[in-house]
A protein has these predicted regions:
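Beta-lactam-recognizing serine transpeptidase/beta-lactamase-like catalytic domain environment
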Residues: 1-179
Length: 179
């Protein structure tokens, strides 16, 4: 639910690791602001609520854990780099852009599923498509809420430079530092 309020007080300490935000957003933010402002602490707390197993299942259904089937052999072999053990810490770091590396094709398929009302469609260069049936990976309500939040990232958040007159652009930035 986009209005659920998350604890964004931090940093989150997990053993020798610290999860921080780029800016201090205060002690609490609703989920829609966690996404709009790109709060690492907020997304990590959401991942804790969901749990590592459910997150892994969702990302697998979204097509983010296996190579994407595609007509071009050069584009179809890319396999995301996944954690060896999908732990609670892995789930938290994956939530804000660490812990999982995906190809541009994976990102396109994932974002397209959100834009398509929660239906994952196999990408294709063929005019008639791949012939594969779309797969429901999230409810239409969840997809609509996700589109609204991603649109908010562009209109009110960290991706304001992505706004294009005449288009309803949605997007997501990353504020996590990668060494």
């Amino acid at each position: 639910n986009p209005t659920t309020v998350m604890n964004t007080q931090g940093p989150i300490r997990w053993g020798k690791f610290k999860i921080r935000d780029y800016h201090d957003y205060g002690a609490k933010l609703p989920v829609w602001e966690v996404i709009t402002k790109s709060s690492n602490i907020g997304t990590a707390r959401i991942a804790q609520m969901i749990g590592a197993e459910e997150q892994q299942k969702f990302l697998t259904n979204l097509g983010m854990t296996d190579p994407i089937k595609f007509e071009m052999i050069e584009a179809s072999g890319g396999k995301p780099l996944l954690p060896k053990k999908w732990s609670e810490l892995s789930a938290m770091t994956i939530s804000y852009g660490h812990g999982l590396s995906a190809t541009p094709m994976h990102l396109a398929v994932g974002y397209a599923a959100i834009a398509n009302g929660g239906l994952r469609i196999q990408p294709s260069l063929l005019k008639g498509g791949s012939g594969a049936e779309p797969v429901r990976v999230m409810s239409t309500a969840s997809a609509a809420n996700s589109v609204k939040m991603l649109r908010g990232v562009v209109t009110d958040g960290t991706a304001s430079m992505g706004e294009v007159a005449g288009y309803a652009v949605a997007g997501k930035t990353g504020t996590a530092d990668k060494p």
